[in-house]
Amino acid sequence: MSTDILRKIEAYKREEIAAAKAERTVADLKARAQDQEAPRGFFKALEAKRAAGEFALIAEIKKASPSKGLIRPDFDPPALAKAYEAGGAACLSVLTDTPSFQGAPEFLTAARNACSLPALRKDFLFDTYQVHEARSWGADCILIILASVDDDLAKALEETAFELGMDALIEVHDEAEMERALKLSSRLLGVNNRNLRTFEVDLAVSERLSKMAPADRVLVGESGIFTHEDCLRLKKSGIGTFLIGESLMRQADVAAATRELLTGKA
């Protein structure tokens, strides 16, 4: 996503946030969060898979994207969540952004309620209000994209997530962002293999940035991971956790495709 696209997204997100704040206060969101099941432990679920010697998959529920258009016409979040769980995924990632991804908050709630996996709110966050929103919808983790926020906002988003018992996935796509991410507390670092200016995807980004991460950080490979061989390639750089959406979303049998991606066996 180019800087221009990120700017456009920020503009409509800030409008969305202002409209949401006019409708519901943070106190309202906190009350709604009380009705939700407690956070399921997103980071913990990933660690459990890795401790068992398995790849840990954050499986994405995504209807469409700005670059690819409609990805899955028969879009059924609860059924997809169950298929991912049956296929061995550790966690879910659910798009809640409507203008660019045809996502929705109710997709997150419905997907999470259909299975026992923890769920990430996949969205562009520019205000701690959105973290409270995420928890009120049932999210167990938030995404902080360092290409779109400064250090102070990143820290505020992370602290709010931790206060609510959630985890935070910090997304980076170059060396400068990795250095910034290492100053935050979260041990969960997503490396986006997509160049935000050219849209080109290259797994070498993960291989390169993995050298900067201390052993206590868990690296998540994002974008450009389509096969079990891709997973094995990144494993050589110490990456055994992946966020994968589009390649699985396009499959007729999502559970079988998930299993094959993780194990190499049909």
From Swiss-Prot:
Record flagged with keyword Amino-acid biosynthesis: yes
The record's catalysed reaction(s) read: 1-(2-carboxyphenylamino)-1-deoxy-D-ribulose 5-phosphate + H(+) = (1S,2R)-1-C-(indol-3-yl)glycerol 3-phosphate + CO2 + H2O
Q: Which UniProt keywords apply?
A: Amino-acid biosynthesis, Aromatic amino acid biosynthesis, Decarboxylase, Lyase, Tryptophan biosynthesis
Its pathway, per UniProt, is: Amino-acid biosynthesis; L-tryptophan biosynthesis; L-tryptophan from chorismate: step 4/5
User: Pfam families in the record, alphabetically?
Assistant: IGPS (PF00218)
EC number assigned by the record = 4.1.1.48
Residue intervals passing through the bilayer: none
Sorted alphabetically, which PROSITE patterns does this protein's record hold? IGPS (PS00614)
**How would you classify this enzyme at the top EC level?**
lyase
* GO MF annotations, alphabetized: indole-3-glycerol-phosphate synthase activity; phosphoribosylanthranilate isomerase activity
Give the GO terms filed under biological process for this record: L-tryptophan biosynthetic process
- Write down the SUPFAM superfamilies for this protein, in alphabetical order: Ribulose-phoshate binding barrel (SSF51366)
InterPro entries in the cross-refs? Aldolase_TIM (IPR013785), Indole-3-glycerol_P_synth (IPR045186), Indole-3-glycerol_P_synth_dom (IPR013798), Indole-3-GlycerolPSynthase_CS (IPR001468), RibuloseP-bd_barrel (IPR011060)
Give yes or no: UniProt keyword Kinase: no
Q: Which domain of life is it from?
A: Bacteria
Q: Which family does it belong to?
A: Belongs to the TrpC family.
What HAMAP family does this protein map onto? IGPS_B
The protein in question is named Indole-3-glycerol phosphate synthase
Per the UniProt record, the lineage of the source organism begins with: Bacteria, Pseudomonadati, Pseudomonadota, Alphaproteobacteria, Hyphomicrobiales
